[in-house]
Amino acid sequence: QTTINQIFKKQERDDVCQQICRFLYTNAISFNCVNNPEFAKMVAMIGKYGVGLKQPSYHEVRETFLKKEVLRTMEMFEEYKVEWSKSSCTIMSDGWTDKKRRSICKFLVNTPKGTVFLASIDTSDISKTAQKVFEMLDDIIERVGEENVVQVVTNNAANYKLAGEYLMEKRKHLFWTPCAVHCIDLILEDFEKKLDAHRVTIEKGRRITTYIFSRTLLLTWLKDFIKGKELICNTPERPTMTRFSTAYLTLGCLNENKGALISMFASDKWKSSRFVKADKGKSIETIVMDTRGFWPNVSSCLKGALPLSKVLRMVDSDHKPAMGFIYEEMDLAKAKIQENFNNVKKSYERIWSIIDQRWESQLHRPLHAAAYFLNPHYHYSTNFKVNVDVKIGLYKCLERMIPDATERVKIDMQIDLFKNAKGLFGIESAVLTRKKKSPGDWWDSYGDECPELKRFDIRVLSLTCSSSGCERNWSAFEMVHTKRRNRLHQQKMNDLVFVMYNLKLKERE
């Protein structure tokens, strides 16, 4: 039975929550902020302090506690810096332009321990030539320490590609690698541009979703027919939402809800509505009810695109470093596409051709090949294949990453022990965990008899394949670079971004 005290406590809580919400409403703060773990900690600490808490002043928020948070973030940053010299570092870079056409370039450092935000540069007044991009990247490498950096990952734009070549010419022991997520997204873009069936079908899919989502009544009807499922793929379980993968994810969701959509447009509700009389409504109905043209084309598009979406999700995952997997996963994606089209060559050969053009010219890199060779997940499989490209990639990595010729010879000799599963490599636990442990952890456990090879392998297999971590959390920059904050001194602005971005990265671990 509810007591009087419980009734009063509920009312007190409602009053407190109402005041918290009023603060959020009057400052136009996103409702989603209540899901931030820091929000829960704040509420708990206020409750623990009890009556009489004096709120922080404007000066304390702007000066005192910001400085403390910068120091706290720097301490966290130092923990990551220790990891830089132990394993492999990837410098990740990406650019962003806000609504006012201000350009920001940011730089992150990734290791197996996690990713940290290092710096951002306002490039609005800088011509982004290959030379300038090279100079910015070179300065960042100097800050991190060339001896700690294995690769620099950026997007595939021509100026970044040329800057990467300049970088590898100056810094003889590291690699420039194009972002795998960006490469795969460009493959999907090529599908849409070069394959008429894809272009037309995607456009029709967009028309359907735009039409329904811009009409509240239709959206309400659709919810009844699809029983609470989502029409647009935007849930965390879905693959990465890149610019061009979104189009195929939308087609996938339309396909999942094909029956519900057809039922809705065949229903009495639709037939008796005002929408059916308008030209747009008639046009959308024609598309949805086209079971011989539109829907088979949707299925065909997905047969070609979804295997690549799987690779996209893998390389963008924070779960494990993807370097040891992308080489084989791209081959598996092509095999899956072939299987989806029942091995009929004329049905998939143009898709394969588009993939190969990007893969061979942009994504196929020495690090990818070396990591494939060194990955125990694949190396001992009956399907493992070592062609000339894989061997060239492996030995190119050895030449660049291991400057001492004597050490390279040692590693080359130790590779034979790995290939033949001799010593620790062949014990039962090593065999049983080849596909269960991450490649880096496996080498850490069983590579002690080959110390030089072990260090080399862990550095390669612990690498990320993408700079997509850079593309997240641009909202941190959006929030700082606004009218309301334009009186902040540049250093405070930098401090605020440094704290916000690294806290957001920490949340994701």
Feature-to-residue mapping (PLM):
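Short alpha-helical patches at protein termini and domain edges
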Residues: 1-509
